[in-house]
Curated annotation (Swiss-Prot):
It comes from the Bacteria. It comes from Pectobacterium atrosepticum (strain SCRI 1043 / ATCC BAA-672) (Erwinia carotovora subsp. atroseptica). This is tRNA pseudouridine synthase A. Residues 181-185 are annotated as: Interaction with tRNA. The keyword tRNA processing applies. GO terms for biological process: tRNA pseudouridine synthesis. NCBIfam families: hisT_truA. Residues 120-124 are annotated as: RNA binding.
Length: 283
């Protein structure tokens, strides 16, 4: 083959590569948010998104931008975050998992990979999100895993917290549990699961909804803790919900106890469903 013919073949292959429809890939992501200024890429501060995109771009050998199921705030963690991206790069699954993990810092990891249909969207295809909030309920603060839970030294009655929270189930106006700076067009959300359980010195508040307004879980937890320690009656949560006034509710619980543990999608996408966690917690 002459040099001219060889060059033409290489050029034709490059053109064909560029004209090929891009692949859409979904990833499951786990991260410890303690050292990051939230999920979203920002200028001059560390973010989970920026670290992930840098690692993916290196493996793909092209710029990669990801879209996520839900943006988490500074200090918030994830065991069940889902993202998607499009790429012209053809790689084995091991490259998108182990290869990307080799280029990520130790506190971010890819848990699974799946090629998805072109109509999949990590955010808009999701039908529900699930969060767990971890409280270390002991007189003395923890030293181990202190950035992965919130310490509360007054004894908490989980039965009171559980009963008080049941009024939040269903579709409601969550203005009383919505951050003032929330940009959502509506405060209405549909909560279909809320459980409060104790595991020794650890308390878990487990909430699932179609979506959440800004700081909704942390604001609910802050008010439930007021009920749990006896500062407020069980009926107070229902009163707050009806009042639609954020200034009447409890303080926002700290970020370090919060985990995005799962995102639900229609069965037709057949996404992997790993254990939610965090740590010792079963599904």
């Amino acid at each position: 083959m002459s040099e001219t013919t060889q060059a033409a073949a290489i050029q034709a292959a490059a053109v064909a590569e560029n004209e090929r429809a891009p692949l859409k890939i979904a990833l499951g992501i786990e991260y410890d948010g303690s050292q990051y200024y939230g999920w979203q890429r920002q200028i001059d501060v560390a973010s989970v998104q920026a670290c992930l995109e840098k690692a993916l771009s290196k493996v793909a050998d092209e710029p990669i931008e990801v879209l996520c199921a839900g943006r988490t705030d500074a200090g918030v963690h994830g065991t069940g975050q889902v993202v998607h991206f499009t790429t012209q790069a053809i790689r084995k699954d091991a490259a998108w998992t182990m290869g990307v993990n080799a280029n990520l810092p130790p506190d971010i990891a890819v848990r699974w990979v799946k090629a998805v249909h072109e109509d999949f969207h990590a955010r808009f295809s999701a039908t529900a999100r699930r969060y767990r909030y971890i409280i270390y309920n002991h007189r003395y603060r923890p030293a181990v895993l202190s950035h992965g839970m919130t310490h509360f030294y007054h004894p908490l009655d989980v039965e009171r917290m559980e009963r008080a929270g049941q009024c939040l189930l269903g579709e409601n106006d969550f203005t009383s549990f919505r951050a003032v700076q929330c940009q959502s067009r509506t405060p209405w959300r549909n909560v279909n699961h809320l459980k409060v359980t104790r595991h020794g010195n650890y308390i878990v508040v487990d909430i699932k909804a179609n979506a959440f307004v800004h700081h909704m879980v942390r604001n609910i937890v802050g008010s439930l803790m007021d009920v749990g320690c006896g500062n407020r009656p069980e009926s107070w949560i229902a009163e707050l919900l009806a009042a639609k006034d954020r200034t009447l509710a409890g303080a926002t619980a700290r970020a370090e106890g919060l985990y995005l543990v799962a995102v639900d999608y229609p069965a037709r996408f057949a996404l992997p469903q790993p254990t939610m966690g965090p740590l010792f917690l079963a599904d």
